[in-house]
Design a protein with these regions (language model features):
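Glyoxalase I/VOC metalloenzyme domain signal
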Residues: 2-71, 78-159, 168-243, 254-377
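Short, solvent-exposed loop/turn elements at beta->coil junctions and helix N-caps
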Residues: 74-76, 164, 247-252
Length: 377
């Protein structure tokens, strides 16, 4: 019997488990909620984008999505290291961050996140462009989330760190572990109840502002090379359970395909789908294209929940200049919709949104925007 290469590294538990697991597809998948979270995970807390110009980027997103500025940390607040802005609409919170020149940074100062490394930030932007750096999850105890997740194989990035909020007299505790690629999973706890990250200067919303009706993050989708290995890693460190799954047979076309699994926390308010490319189609999988353009795994898209999608769409179209919508489908597509989902919408409403069937008997109206940056999120 031949011997293995002495330099071969043993397979991790996650890799071994991934090799054993098989996708069954949407039709054969049976959803069960085992309430398996390994620590108390509540909801999405915030999403942080790393960008080259936080000032112009937050203004674009704020205008295009109807999300007013809720807090800032920049030179006007005494932060000489970086500019960072928080937008909020209901429970939906986006943070946009970019460093100032490292040569101008002053020691001490009012930087809520003094650990932010400008070199690492610019390397991230060079590779990924405008993209999501952190997916923040609200947890009961950030230190406990760190202890349990790292004990179960999470690759630590930032140990539990306390950020004081002078305005409210409260404090926030957060920590970070690797999620996929250069994206981190950020656990957020503590007594601070404001939006985003503590230590920022709160901003009052414009008088009479009602926004566009966006109220929370529905799900955050990642693209990876190996779906099962990634899913097993996420399940192992958090205890998340499988909420849904789709194979190329379910959601692919003759041109392009993908496999996808959706993970959820106990309450199923945190939904985190993960996609991988499939091969053998006429065209390259859109997931493979993303992985190439993003120079590796990353967060592909964010789904934003609204209680009135028609109001939101009309407001976004009226604002213009923020986001472009994907082209409408053909007339033949809309003509067939009533026989698929009934007459819950009028013919005019069918043309205003696109409808997708996520599961049998489960239909949701969607309207897709073009990417926020070429080839990225």
């Amino acid at each position: 019997m031949g011997k293995g290469n002495a330099n071969d590294e043993p397979l991790s538990d996650v890799t071994v488990e991934a090799k054993r697991r098989k996708l069954v597809g949407c039709k054969n998948f049976q959803r069960v909620n085992p309430k398996s979270d390994k620590f108390d995970i509540k909801r999405f807390h915030h999403i942080e984008f790393w960008c080259g110009d936080a000032t112009n980027t937050y203004k674009r997103f704020g205008h295009g999505l109807g999300m007013p500025l809720a807090a800032r940390s920049d030179q006007s607040t005494g932060n000489s290291r970086y500019a960072s802005y928080t937008l909020r609409s209901g429970e939906l919170v986006f943070v946009f961050t970019s460093p100032y020149s490292a040569a101008c940074a002053q020691p001490g100062g009012a930087a809520p996140m003094p650990w932010l490394d400008a070199g690492r930030h610019w390397e991230f932007v060079r590779k990924h462009g405008l993209a999501v750096r952190a997916v923040g999850l609200s947890v009961a105890d950030a230190a406990e989330a760190w202890r349990v997740s790292t004990a179960n194989g999470a690759r630590g990035v930032l140990p539990p760190t306390t950020i004081e909020d002078p305005e409210s007299g409260t404090a926030q505790e957060l920590c970070e572990v690797e999620l996929y690629g250069d994206v981190v999973l950020r656990f957020v706890g503590g007594t601070f109840k404001g939006p985003g990250i503590a230590g920022y200067k709160a901003e009052a919303p414009p008088e009479g502002s009602t926004g566009f009706g966006l109220n929370r993050l529905d799900h955050a989708v990642g693209n990876v090379h190996d779906l099962l290995e990634q899913v097993n890693y996420m399940e192992k460190i958090t205890g998340f359970h499988e909420f849904a799954e789709f194979t190329a047979e379910d959601v692919g076309t003759v041109d392009s395909g993908l496999n996808s699994m959706v993970l959820a926390n106990n309450s199923e308010f945190v939904l985190m789908p993960v996609n991988e490319p499939t091969f053998g189609t006429k065209r390259k999988s859109q997931i493979q294209t993303y992985l190439e353009q993003n120079e590796g795994p990353g967060l592909q898209h964010l789904a934003l929940k609204t209680d009135d999608i028609f109001r939101t769409i009309r407001a976004m179209r009226s604002a213009s200049g923020g986001f472009d919508f994907m082209p409408r489908a053909s007339d033949a597509y809309y003509a067939k919709l009533p026989e698929k989902i009934g007459d819950s919408l009028t013919p005019e409403q069918y043309k205003e949104v696109e409808v997708t069937r996520s599961q049998e008997l489960f239909y949701r109206p969607w309207l897709f925007c073009r990417e926020g940056a070429p080839g990225r999120t």
